[in-house]
Structure formats: C-alpha cells, structure tokens
C-alpha cells in the first residue's frame, strides 16, 4: 500500500511538470497548456525568442529558428529552458515545428525534466477562423512520458484545447489533458492582454488558472500570472 502511494505521488509531480508554449506573440502558462502552440499563429520567417517571468517565481526562455521552407510552409528548430523559483533548471525542450501560411501547424519535441525523465510530444493545430478581428485555433497533443525512476513504467498523456484572439490584442484559451496510468485529468484556463507591440517586439500580460482531479486527489483552481517579452530578429 505504501509503495502504491509513493508511486502515485511521484507520478503526480512528474505529470504536473510544465509544458512549454510559444505563440506569436508568446503565451506561456504552466502545466498542461498545449505544446503544439510552438507553432506560430501565422508563418513568419524570422528567428525569434521570448522570456517569461511568473508571479510564482518561475521563469522561462524559448527560441525558434527557421531552417527550411517554401512560400507556404516553414520548418523551424525550437528549444526552451524552464527555471524554477530557485533558478534551477526545471525542464529543457528541443524539437522541430512546421508552420503553414494558413495558420495550421505541427511539432515534435522532447522535454527532459531533471529528477523525472523525458517526455516525447507530438502536437498539431488547425486554424478555424482568421480575419481582422478574430482568430480561433483548435489544437491537440499526445505525449509519451518516459520516467527514469525505478519501477515507474512509461505512460501516456493526451489533450486538446482552443485558443482565441481578438484584434491580436486580447486572448483566451481553454484546455484539458488526460493521463492514463493514474487516471488524472488536468484543466486550464488562460487569458492574455497585449501591452505593447511593434513589428519585431511584443510585451504581454498572461493570466492562468489550473486544476486537476484523480480518483483519490482533487485540487482547487490555482492562479498564476506573468509577463512575457518576445522578440523577432
């Protein structure tokens, strides 16, 4: 019984580790926000990066560099580092993303989490609405979690969500994820307000709320707030 409790505790910590997110401009809220948002809302052929600071003391940096493409599709190398509130590496991610001129995209990434193991994630998104006022995108992902912890098996997490932007100024998102091994569901809501924007620089305020439930443990909605700076080169 004690062994099962320890296993559950370890998995709860591992599954709760942050996925990294980058959009145009960046939108970064922790937990099960969707990694397919590595793909930009519209194709840009510039290298760009972003830095985010959160009110809980965590921070992160991401970079995306185009390496090949055509008039319709761009393939980019992507990477990121998440820092804990003690400025230690919480996660490191690397992978590839493809962006389509119509706002569709896909990515494959590997995330290494010290003390836990690796997560291999395939993700994609489809742009449903895009005009001068509204942008609506649906997305989904599947992750193979590969713990380096003895006696803990590999397991899967799948999820999906929607992202909405109004006049490229105010945004909202909602997502849900399910982890099969411990029957855990994660829920997240997010909001974004663009504070400053030029053709190559964007500053945003981000707000998020998250919760999870399992057959034995449930959480309340937990808030998190932060600011992000993204830059195109």
Curated annotation (Swiss-Prot):
Alphabetically ordered keywords of this record: Antibiotic, Antimicrobial, Cleavage on pair of basic residues, Immunity, Innate immunity, Secreted, Signal
What's a single GO CC term here?
extracellular region
The subcellular location is:
Secreted
Q: Which GO terms describe its biological process?
A: defense response to bacterium; innate immune response
- What Pfam family is a match, any one? Attacin_N
Task: Determine the domain of life of the protein's source.
Answer: Eukaryota
Q: Which residues form the propeptide?
A: 18-45
Look up the signal peptide feature and give its range: 1-17
Q: What does this protein do?
A: Has antibacterial activity against both Gram-positive and Gram-negative bacteria.
Similarity remark: Belongs to the attacin/sarcotoxin-2 family.
What is the name listed in the Swiss-Prot or TrEMBL entry for this protein?
Defense protein 3
Species for this entry = Lonomia obliqua (Moth)
